[in-house]
Regions:
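Extracellular/lumenal glycan-associated context and N-glycosylation machinery
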Residues: 1-338
């Protein structure tokens, strides 16, 4: 029988699975619910594998074999992956998520560590590992099959359209990245330094994210994010050159920074020609606002302005990115049309 600590870990995993199922019931979108259920299934398998070790002697080797079979299935699915569609934007969004789920199975370098102190926990972790691969493969197939079932019989491939657009956008991103000005080394303003570092790091990695994408659909999404990041950097540079300090002294200044971020996100949703293309980027911007809100909520009483740097960076970065979204989406659509 497992000792108290191990029994607690198995119980906690089962409880975690139950909690994630409940969260899935009230998730704001089906994709969020799907991710919650993936988490729930992995936690449930962790607990089940641990108890199976006790009840019937489930071995690590059996789970390794099961994982190898799943990877083999994933390779077969990957070799048959066809980018059928009638609209490259919609196709890229669905296939992109399927690509990422599939890539998580095929390119997962994590392997559960063999615990000499507890073979039971090793088996439990392998159960989690196996189930994570299984549900991601199943969900990739589900999204793929569900989307293709909506297509007309004469739907053609959008693979070339996506790949050509990605190459055009990659060249654009490379050109823009080369044009990034050198970051100043004599600015001792911590707020400006943090903001510049946050925006610049995203801009500099823009091409890498496209190159590392598991397929053309994800690459298009990464190119859209990259363009947004580079345009946001341009906006930041312009504001810094105009003498903007981004500093705050009063609660009203903080409120104005937050309002600007929320308004920018709302405006981007209205102004972007294909909202679905940029919604993930704007969702990230909204999360930045939420993170800043949580940080502010933790303060109590009088607060020194320097302690507001983190939320102000979050609000300002969200504003810069959201305001850059419409132009980025226009550039992506132009690339798809050529």
């Amino acid at each position: 029988m497992p000792n108290g600590y191990i029994r607690q870990r198995l119980t906690e995993a089962a409880e975690e699975a139950t909690d994630r199922v409940e969260e899935a019931r009230t998730a704001p979108s089906r994709l969020v619910a799907l991710n919650k259920l993936q988490w729930a299934q992995s936690e449930a398998r962790y607990a089940a594998a641990g108890w199976a070790f006790v009840d019937r002697g489930l071995a690590e080797a059996e789970l390794r074999s099961e994982h190898q079979a799943i990877v083999s299935e994933a390779n077969s699915f990957d070799s048959e992956f066809a980018y059928l569609g009638t609209d490259p934007i919609t196709a890229s969004l669905v296939y992109g998520q399927a690509e990422r789920f599939l890539d998580s199975v095929l390119d997962d370098g994590r392997t559960p560590t063999s615990r000499k102190s507890s073979q039971l926990l090793t088996v439990a972790e392998w159960g989690d590992h196996v189930e994570t691969a299984r549900v991601q493969l199943d969900d990739a197939r589900y999204l793929y099959d569900r989307y293709q079932s909506t297509l007309p019989d004469d739907a053609g491939s959008v693979a070339d359209t996506l790949s050509t657009a990605v190459e055009t956008l990659r060249s654009d991103l490379q050109h823009r990245r080369k044009g990034l000005p050198e970051a100043p080394t004599d600015d001792d303003n911590r707020l400006r330094w943090r903001l510049r570092d946050d925006i610049r790091s995203n801009a500099e990695s823009s091409v890498d994210r496209v190159d590392e994408a598991p397929g053309p659909a994800t690459a298009l999404s990464m190119a859209t994010r990259g363009l947004t990041a580079l345009l946001a950097h341009d906006r930041l540079t312009d504001r810094l050159e105009d003498g903007e300090t981004f500093g705050v002294e009063t609660a009203a200044d903080v409120r104005d920074a937050r309002t600007a971020a929320v308004d920018a996100i709302t405006a981007a949703l209205d102004e972007s020609p294909r909202t679905a293309l940029v919604r993930p980027i704007l969702a990230d911007a909204a999360r930045s606002v939420s993170f800043a809100d949580d940080r502010l909520a933790a303060f109590d009483g009088d607060v020194r302005p320097s302690r507001l740097d983190h939320p102000i960076v979050e609000y300002t970065a969200a504003t810069l990115r959201a305001r850059s979204v419409p132009a980025a989406s226009e550039t992506v659509l132009d690339a798809l049309d050529t």
